[in-house]
Amino acid sequence: MIDHTHLRLFQFCDSQFPTGAFSHSFGLETYIQRNIIHDDHTFIAWLKMFLQEQLTYSDGLAMRLVYDALENDDTQKVLHIDKLMFVQNLPKETRVGAKQMGTRMVKLALELYNSPWIAWYHQQMQDKKAKLNPAICFTMLGHHLGVDIETIIDYYLYQNVSSLTQNAVRAIPLGQTAGQKIVTHMIPYIEETRKQIFELKEADFGMTAPGLELNQMAHENVNVRIFIS
């Protein structure tokens, strides 16, 4: 029998879910315009780097820490991680983009579920105590639905892989079949990344490859674009 609890969380993994993820490449478009990424092989290399760097040391580790804070009713810890997620995101477009996506996800989650934690998180934003981040909201939703943190992280990583692949299909461009092959190819790396996240210390938070951040910053000066970041 299908676990409907997992299906409810997986709904938020749809690349067409209206959080605005389809409008953000997180620096991918810069690599494409510089012809560093130009086919499925070069995109896979970039996607692995993004998964094993930015999504590991920022989003993934933050999710693990937030889940522990939720279990311990530690509101100050959640606010601290929310702040760190915002200030360590140096490129303006990705920082603002993450805030916008977090806001949309929180509002959608509140429309669909009566989660006290997500309602509290939204109130903190209204009180100007939180910025709102999609990784934190996704963790709160999974926690509300009773999903274990390992599965929550797997689903979140999958959502990012799927969304970025669909964006690559449009931007490089690639065929839809090639895109699905890439997602299939990346599934083992999702598991590897989740395992790595659970080996990290809190002091590892925010470690990101400089090349990723530099290309995300450079996207501000891209003349012709189809993505916001």
From Swiss-Prot:
Species annotation: Staphylococcus aureus (strain JH9)
Identification of the protein by name: Urease accessory protein UreF
Keywords, in A-Z order: Chaperone, Cytoplasm, Nickel insertion
UniProt similarity note: Belongs to the UreF family.
Chief location category: cytoplasm
Localisation per UniProt entry: Cytoplasm
Keyword Cytoplasm: yes
Gene Ontology terms: cellular component: cytoplasm
